UniProtKB/Swiss-Prot annotation:
This is tRNA N6-adenosine threonylcarbamoyltransferase. GO terms for cellular component: cytoplasm. Substrate binds at L138, V139, S140, G141, G142, D171, G184, N283. Required for the formation of a threonylcarbamoyl group on adenosine at position 37 (t(6)A37) in tRNAs that read codons beginning with adenine. Is involved in the transfer of the threonylcarbamoyl moiety of threonylcarbamoyl-AMP (TC-AMP) to the N6 group of A37, together with TsaE and TsaB. TsaD likely plays a direct catalytic role in this reaction. Signal peptide: none annotated. Gene3D superfamilies: 3.30.420.40. Its EC number is 2.3.1.234. Binds 1 Fe(2+) ion per subunit. One of its GO terms (molecular function) is iron ion binding. Its cofactor is Fe(2+). Pfam families: TsaD.
């Protein structure tokens, strides 16, 4: 049964995991995450230099912890994997160098993993993972995309955000409302007691040059502007803002847009399976309404397990095992890191003459 030691350091979460491929599917033998949220919260967002330093401090302890829990040594792994793109370059370098060093010392293959491919693989950690073809809504702090996963043709992007990702919009609106960082959980908490219908907010659409709109694309910049104007108008009338209602109205409109366009994309492609992954996929309102409306429209909705929605190393291990199982082999030990790399070109990470 193939086993990998997987590392994740693409942003502000240091993580390590041991993942095994068994007869019943993927099994997470151990996983640990060291979050830096509290440290970055005072700055209102991630500070790259701080993130890199904390990865250096945390990663060795995390690796020791998961190996101890799994009762295994690095020498018993079939491979070592680490996220190498996209992300903060300094942060990525910590995980990549650590992974490549361990692989070289123990004579194991190294697999450089695309961060978005890892998110896509997170649904394979569910008890009953879906089978391709299906549409994936990848919705996180840095990405909002609709992706077709097909066993024959691979990955094809069908829709994307043209400005902020949904998670980034949550962070910025939370800051506008004076709520904590990260914005997703803060807005969700405030929205519980709010009226989601109190404020009318726009559903951003992206115009085609030839007329009409891109049906599966997203834009959240107009929504942010509308929230800013709403807050300014309310402050002109009173010092006390109806934070719960503002949070609920914002959360609801984002959920409406994500649900409507995702299900439409799925049905337009003649598919009956939709997968949702990424940090924002942990949002309760989004999970409930996606499943509910999916049932009403004949679409089976598969959600990444909550523990593996936000950045983690188990999903990196899942992606690496998927590549091994598909016969992609390993990455070059000379593979570096890159702040950006197309998801569709993820196979380039396994070339023996690396492009970065």
């Amino acid at each position: 049964m193939p086993k990998v030691l997987a590392l994740e350091t693409s942003c502000d979460e240091s993580a390590a995991a041991v993942v095994q491929h068994s007869a019943g599917g993927l099994e997470v033998l151990a996983h640990r995450i060291a979050s830096q949220v509290e440290e970055h919260a005072q700055w209102g967002g991630v500070v790259p230099e701080i993130a890199s330093r904390r990865h250096v401090e945390a990663l060795p302890h995390l690796i020791s912890a998961v190996l101890d829990e799994a009762g295994l040594a690095v020498g018993e792994m079939d491979a070592v994997a680490a996220t190498v793109t996209p992300g903060l370059v300094g942060a990525l370098m910590v995980g990549s160098l650590t992974g490549r060093t361990l692989a070289a010392l123990h004579h194991k293959p190294f697999l450089g993993v695309h961060h978005l491919e890892a998110h896509l693989a997170s649904v394979r950690l569910a008890s009953s993972p879906p089978e391709a073809p299906y549409v994936v809504l990848l919705v996180s702090g840095g990405h909002t995309e609709l992706i077709l996963v097909d066993s024959d043709s691979g990955l094809q992007r069908l829709g994307r955000s043209h400005d902020d990702a949904a998670g980034e919009a949550f962070d910025k609106v939370a800051r506008l409302l004076g709520l904590a960082y990260p914005g997703g959980p803060a807005i969700q908490a405030a929205a519980k007691a709010g009226d989601p219908k109190r404020f009318s907010l726009p559903k951003g659409r992206v115009s085609r040059p030839e007329g009409g709109f891109y049906p599966y694309d997203f834009s959240f910049s107009g929504l942010k502007t509308a929230m800013l104007r709403q807050v300014e108008s309310l402050k002109a009338q009173s010092d006390a803002l109806p934070l719960e209602d503002l949070a609920a109205s914002f959360e609801q409109i984002v959920v409406d847009v994500l649900v409507e366009r995702s299900l439409r994309c799925c049905l337009d492609r003649g598919l009956s399976t939709l997968v949702m992954v990424g940090g924002v996929a942990a949002n309760v309102r989004l999970r409930v309404q996606m499943e509910q409306q999916g049932r009403e429209r004949g679409v089976s909705v598969h959600l990444a397990p909550l523990a593996y929605c936000t950045d983690n190393a188990a999903m990196v291990g899942a992606a690496a095992l998927g590549r091994l199982q598909a016969g992609w082999g390993s990455s070059s030990i000379r593979l570096g890191v890159s702040a950006r790399w197309p998801l569709e070109a993820g196979g380039d990470l396994y070339a023996q003459d690396p492009q970065f």
